[in-house]
Amino acid sequence: MAEITVGQLAQQTNKEVDALLKQLKSFGIEKSSEKDTLTPTEMKTLLEKINSAKNTATRKKVTSVKLDGKHKINVSVKRKRRVAKKVEQQESTTLEQPQELETMVQEVSQQVDIVKEQDNIEQIVENKEAVKVQEQRQAEIAKPVIKDSGFKITAMPEIKIEEIVAEDDEGLAASDKQAKKKAAKKVFSEAVNTNTKYKREEEEKKSKAKKAGGKGFKKANPRQLSQLAGDLESFDEFGAKKGKLKAPKVKKQEFTKPVENTVRTVEIHEGITVSELAQKMAVKGAEIVKVLFNMGVMATINQSLDQDTAILIVEEMGHKYTLHNENALEEAVTIVDRSSYKKISRAPVVTIMGHVDHGKTSLLDYIRQTRVVAGEAGGITQHIGAYSVKTDKGSITFLDTPGHEAFTSMRARGAKSTDIVILVVAADDGVMPQTEEAIQHAKAARVPIVVAVNKIDKPEADPDKVISELAQRNVIPESWGGDVMFVNVSAKTGEGVADLLEAVLLQSEVLELEAFAEGLAEGVVIESRLEKGRGPVATVLVQNGNLKQGDNILCGTEYGRVRAMHNDLGKKIKAAGPATPVEILGLSGVPAAGDEMVVIENEKKAKELAAQRSQKQKEAKIAQEQSLKLSNMFNNMGKEGEQQVLKIILKGDVQGSVEAIRESLLKLSTDEVKVDIIASGIGAITSSDVTLAVASTAVVIGFNVRADSAAKKLAETDGVEFRYYNIIYDLIDDVKKAMSGLLSPEMKEQIIGIAEVREVYRSSKFGSIAGCMVIEGVVKRTNPIRVLRNNVVIYEGTLESLKRFKDDASEVKKGLECGIGVKNYNDVREGDQIEVFEVIEVAKEL
């Protein structure tokens, strides 16, 4: 057996060096440090000691005893600590002290050393006659043990003296080992001739030695060392046994790294699936399904979860969570920190609105001293024009719109681009339908109005008529005690234009308009188009910051780099400040009017945000198509205080019909639901009505009018539904239904029949059967009933049977006799009344 150090033995047996040194000392092997080596003889002694003590720890022993030469009896003896003492007292042949065992083991080892050099050791083996004598003695002693014992012997104390199963050293011969075994057997048999128990055990040693044959020692291997480790583990540091030894198991020497529970931070977005959540927590989907099941939720791995449920799961499994902010990218990119910049006063942005041919563009043309009208088809504005005008008292930015449609479109997209509205009204024409619509849009956006009464140079001009008509539309002039400035102008002669500009600048001073002139630019798209050879072209109004050529910009769902900029005069510029309209090139597509324009430092982020906005826009469009239908309108009614509001846009063929319908609908308003007609007018439903409906979440109603082609196309795009009527009462009834849809229906009981009990019969199948006469209404088999006695309800339930003569009947009418069986009730008496009723829903009415 190769030499091994104490440290190596401690490492292979997974024991501390100090504990191993104490055990070696208790076995008579003196070692002082882990570097000391163990010789083959010491290793052999160590194995003998361990195996010897190991055998004495056996708690159960089964002994086979021959009774008459043919039959055998198995004696099973179990020994516990408290029982062992009694057995030792009762049996005089039992070994008295464990120290005797140690003495015998020492004698055996001495004899092994003595006979090591002898050559004729094999002649010492006992003959067969001695073996027979021993068997007879065993049988004689075993009989009285079985006969006289006052308790059942389930285990016999056993102390194994020798069982050398050590591994050998390469230098020892097999014959020497066999000689040692046989010499030990002889010495021990002579020492215990007076003890029957040890004779039996010595017999077992002989049989085992014969089976072992001439096997020699082999080199120790890791399995045997691990077995040695298991043996050493059964002793404490003083060499005493710890407890019952089990069969030695092969111990693999390996190192298991301690692993702490990993706490993960899980990002939860709305609609996360079970499989996605499992992947983020690095667990199997079945574990999350199990947690959901314990929470009372049946789910599959592909099922979507709301954020609250996902949070509960993450916390239940010991992880942390963060909620995914869908607008995180947009907030990080679009929100600009301007805390270090100072605000400066800026020019007002003025939108000119009014009816067709009332002189909007002519007035602006005179102000700019250019001939823009000549370039427009038919003298009517086709596109939005944005112009910056310098005056002696400051600059003004004008937006010339085609009517008011673009203004509405911008408001529908949440863009607040206009500061002041100039309402142009022809003095010879007065207030027209588009004039009223312009007033409605300006008030909806809460923008101050300055009225320009145009064409006062004409002989038929009547400014007072214009003032009177506008006052009827709640546009009260300052001369009448209102807050609206009226200025008489002539776009042809230029009369009053200076006063108009002064009124606009005065209004802007009241508003105290300010903006940041530094930092990344922000603005709004006024108009956009696709030009041949230039690509997408967008007219942008800068609202904050400084827009420079080469900036990366994001406009709604479109992005790009500013490749060129032109001002309102068509000249190339390199930068533009607040309240400056510019024309830019370089976008990926044509943005929509009213889209916000922001400058982003990273072009990659701009592209990513544009794709995200496009996806959100598609989802919002699908949801909007359903929300704008009249049938679901009560689900989307806005609240003003505690009232719910139904918004309506009303268009009719004549003014009288529109006024009549308007008054009728306003009278429908109650404390719970209010009708708000946000716009009304004469003529066909136009695209401006559609954009206003989208912006205000209103329903469009047409009385004897239809929508034009442009409005139909826009309505199809935005998912707006038109409702056409030619009878006023049908229109009012439908609006009533839309308003009543929010009110929950009432449940009402209605008595449909009464039957009087004339006689009571007994039935083996139904119990008490009441012979009745229907005295009122009709008795139906399926309806609930009440039993009345002296006009007091004593039972409420259902009918079990209803018969007319011997036939089953579904109903029995007034004046006919019938047999009635009441379910689960047998105390029916003569003179009782059976009342049949039904529960109906009654819708609340306004």
From Swiss-Prot:
Q: Where is the composition biased (Basic residues)?
A: 207-219
What InterPro entries does the entry give? DNA-bd_dom_put_sf, EF-G-like_DII, IF2_II, IF2_N, P-loop_NTPase, Small_GTP-bd, T_Tr_GTP-bd_dom, TF_IF2_bacterial-like
- Name the segments for region: G4: 454-457
Q: Identify the residues that bind GTP.
A: 354-361, 400-404, 454-457
Principal location listed in the UniProt entry: cytoplasm
What cellular component terms from Gene Ontology apply here? cytosol
Q: Outline the extent of the tr-type G domain.
A: 345-512
Write out the entry's keywords from A to Z.
Cytoplasm, GTP-binding, Initiation factor, Nucleotide-binding, Protein biosynthesis
Query: Which stretches of sequence are listed as region Disordered?
Result: 198-219
Q: Name one GO molecular function term.
A: translation initiation factor activity
> Which parts of this chain are annotated as the region G5?
490-492
Q: Which Pfam families match?
A: EF-G_D2, GTP_EFTU, IF-2, IF2_N
Q: Where in the cell is it found?
A: Cytoplasm
* Keyword Ribosomal protein assigned: no
- Give positions of region: G1: 354-361
**Which segments carry the region annotation G2?**
379-383
Ranges for the region named G3 are: 400-403
Q: Which family does it belong to?
A: Belongs to the TRAFAC class translation factor GTPase superfamily. Classic translation factor GTPase family. IF-2 subfamily.
**Main function:** One of the essential components for the initiation of protein synthesis. Protects formylmethionyl-tRNA from spontaneous hydrolysis and promotes its binding to the 30S ribosomal subunits. Also involved in the hydrolysis of GTP during the formation of the 70S ribosomal complex.
Name this protein carries in UniProt: Translation initiation factor IF-2
List the source organism: Francisella tularensis subsp. mediasiatica (strain FSC147)
